């Protein structure tokens, strides 16, 4: 929670190697090396934010947030520019810190992949925003989408989140919708269901929640500044 660029500087990232991964994936997508291969890309709204934990572990003020970014390896200029971008829309530094982490680690890299692939193949993007009723403080955290998608609501580690009937019913409803999209995509290369899942180039993402819906593309709002700063 204290090191947002961790996935870019630590071992848990793609490593270029001539025998296995000879080219940066972003460059390969941009050049059309995966042309003709349909893609679904997306992320969860609070991948690594955990709103209730940010209240305890997030930075107490913007100065502390800047210090954390400096400790993670960002230059002062980039750290200040990054925080200025988030400060415009999120006045609370704790909440902003959660968004910074989510955007840097998963949301923006996923949407960037969709943007790069969209000219070359049918590409679809989503944002998973479902929060388990009664556990809203955990947010739509990393991996939560697996419970409704595979229907393993009463298996560990998800069991405590779905003991309530309301939580089970909502997750089961969402899971049926998700499986319809995912299986038709695997079969036909197009995620079929209702609402219609538009192509990413049409400017919308599918919002996976109860109820389902569409969202305008978040890239420019959430990720444009990160790309300008060279953080994507």
Language-model features: locations:
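Mature extracytoplasmic/periplasmic domains
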Residues: 188-216
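A short alpha-helix capping/helix-coil boundary motif
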Residues: 90-93, 158-162, 200-205, 209, ...
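Tryptophan-rich aromatic "cage" segments
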Residues: 213-232
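Generic structural motif
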Residues: 131, 153, 211-213, 231
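Enriched - but not universal
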Residues: 65, 100, 185, 197-200
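Non-catalytic, well-ordered alpha-helical segments in soluble enzyme domains
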Residues: 171-193
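Substrate-gating cap/lid region and adjacent catalytic-acid/histidine neighborhood
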Residues: 1-169, 181
């Amino acid at each position: 929670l204290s090191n947002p660029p961790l996935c870019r500087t630590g071992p848990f990232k793609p490593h270029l190697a001539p025998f296995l991964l000879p080219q940066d994936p972003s460059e390969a997508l941009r050049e059309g090396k995966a042309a003709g291969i349909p893609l679904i890309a997306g992320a969860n709204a609070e991948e690594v934010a955990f709103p209730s934990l940010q209240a305890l572990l997030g930075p107490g003020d913007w100065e502390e947030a800047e210090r954390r970014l400096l400790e993670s390896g960002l230059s002062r200029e980039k750290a200040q520019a990054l925080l200025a971008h988030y400060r415009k829309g999120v006045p609370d530094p704790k909440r902003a810190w959660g968004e910074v982490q989510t955007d840097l680690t998963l949301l923006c890299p996923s949407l960037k992949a969709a943007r790069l692939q969209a000219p070359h193949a049918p590409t679809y993007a989503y944002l998973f925003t479902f929060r388990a009723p009664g556990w809203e403080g955990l947010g739509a955290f990393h991996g939560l989408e697996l419970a409704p998608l595979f229907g393993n609501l009463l298996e560990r580690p998800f069991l405590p989140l779905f003991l309530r009937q309301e939580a089970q019913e909502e997750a089961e409803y969402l899971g049926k919708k998700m499986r319809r999209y995912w299986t038709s995509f695997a079969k036909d290369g197009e995620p079929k269901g209702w609402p219609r899942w538009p192509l990413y180039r049409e400017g919308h993402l599918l919002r996976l929640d109860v109820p389902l819906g569409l969202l305008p593309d978040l890239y420019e709002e959430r990720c444009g500044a990160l790309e300008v700063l060279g953080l994507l």
